[in-house]
A protein has these predicted regions:
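Residue-level signature of the cytosolic catalytic core of signaling kinases
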Residues: 17, 21, 97, 139-142, ...
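Residue-level recognition of transmembrane alpha-helices
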Residues: 45, 107, 148, 152, ...
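Gly/Trp-centered helix-boundary motif
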Residues: 1-127, 131, 135, 160, ...
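Generic hydrophobic transmembrane alpha-helix motif, especially the helices
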Residues: 94, 120, 124-203, 207, ...
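Transmembrane helix-loop junctions in multipass membrane proteins, especially transporters and channels
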Residues: 56-64, 138-143, 171-172, 197, ...
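Juxtamembrane/transmembrane-helix interface segments of polytopic membrane transporters
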Residues: 56, 130, 134, 138, ...
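Short hydrophobic alpha-helical segments within the ABC transporter permease transmembrane module
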Residues: 104-109, 136, 150, 193, ...
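Glycine-rich helix-loop "coupling/hinge" segments at transmembrane-helix boundaries
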Residues: 155, 167-171, 181-182, 195-197, ...
């Protein structure tokens, strides 16, 4: 009588499969941590944010302090600073001084505050306004043509030229700069949101909501708005990087933040005069500007790849 020998279950294969499944990222936060672009861009941007917040503590001297006898000093120059009580303390100009004797290091640190505030404010305002317009334009058909013609007209004008034109109409200041930069960014958000709405408007679950008498605002909030969150987060990073660059360009051209305010653009505008002799006045703010824009763009690329449902499906 023959007997059938049962093969033992392949615990090793099951264990390996379980381990592989356990090692895969399962939540959006795990997906973000598994993306090197998100980690790199986020880390650099976090350092820049901390630098901006801690500028009063990290700076060696008041950025507006003028000392003509110490003008155009090379990086690493040391000197004694006289305080209000008459005492003196040693300080080091880590990035040298400009043509008025102001500390470049302190001015660059304080300049990061302006750049990051402008970038974040423009991104938030552009997304808020563009989202509202895009939702209405994409869902209400008779408004779509009117809205898109206005958006096409705005996009036909180069953003930097439109920003300069808007700056010429108002007094210079950070609020005016934010307004002048965020207006040209609105069409980009509107077109993105409108495209998402058009792709969702004919979905069965939206038609079902319409058939049971759901109001248009409720449909937009409940069914359409959630689908725009991930693309808008990614778009917001690109708008932030663009706004930081445009603010620096406006200040560099002398039509942005007032010259006495320490911004990266203003510092570079002053440093270009003696760039061939004292390059540090332009070099250091330029490095901070380039690194910040690079970090924001890399973060945006990482978020785009991570929040893409197709990639999330492959990784999960």
């Amino acid at each position: 009588m023959s007997t059938l020998e049962e093969s033992p279950p392949d615990f090793e294969v099951d264990s390996a499969a379980s381990a592989a499944a356990a090692s895969r990222p399962r939540t959006i936060w795990q997906l973000l941590l598994y993306n090197p672009s998100v980690c790199f861009g986020g880390a650099v941007l976090a350092v820049m944010l901390l630098t901006a917040l801690l500028a009063p503590f990290l700076g060696t001297i008041d950025p507006s302090n003028i000392a003509p006898i110490y003008r155009n000093k090379v990086p690493g120059t040391e000197r004694m600073l006289r305080l209000e009580d008459g005492s003196e303390v040693p300080i080091t100009h880590w990035m040298g001084t400009d043509m008025l004797g102001r500390d470049v290091y302190s001015r660059v640190l304080y300049g990061s505050q302006i750049s990051l505030v402008v970038g974040l404010a423009v991104a938030i305002l552009s997304i808020a306004v563009g989202l509202a317009i895009g939702l209405v334009s994409g869902y209400i058909r008779w408004l779509d043509g009117i809205v898109m013609r206005v958006m096409d007209g705005l996009m036909a004008i180069p953003g930097i030229l439109l920003a300069i034109a808007l700056m010429s109409l108002f007094n210079a200041g950070i609020g005016t700069v934010i307004f002048a930069i965020f207006i040209p960014e609105i069409p980009r958000v509107v077109r993105l949101v409108r495209a998402i709405v058009l792709s969702i408007r004919e979905e069965p679950y939206v038609e079902a909501a319409i058939s049971v008498g759901t109001s248009v605002p409720l449909i937009l909030i409940r069914h359409v708005l959630p689908n725009t969150i991930a693309p808008l987060i990614v778009q917001g990073t690109y708008i932030c990087a663009s706004a930081i660059l445009v603010e620096a360009i406006l200040s560099f051209l002398g039509v942005g933040i007032p010259p006495e305010t320490p911004t990266w653009g203003n510092i570079m505008a002053e440093g270009r005069i003696l760039f061939q002799i004292f390059p540090h006045n332009l070099l250091y703010p330029g490095i901070f500007l380039a690194v910040t824009i690079l970090a924001v763009n890399v973060l945006g690329d990482g978020l785009r790849d991570t929040l893409d449902p197709r990639m999330a499906k492959r990784l999960g």
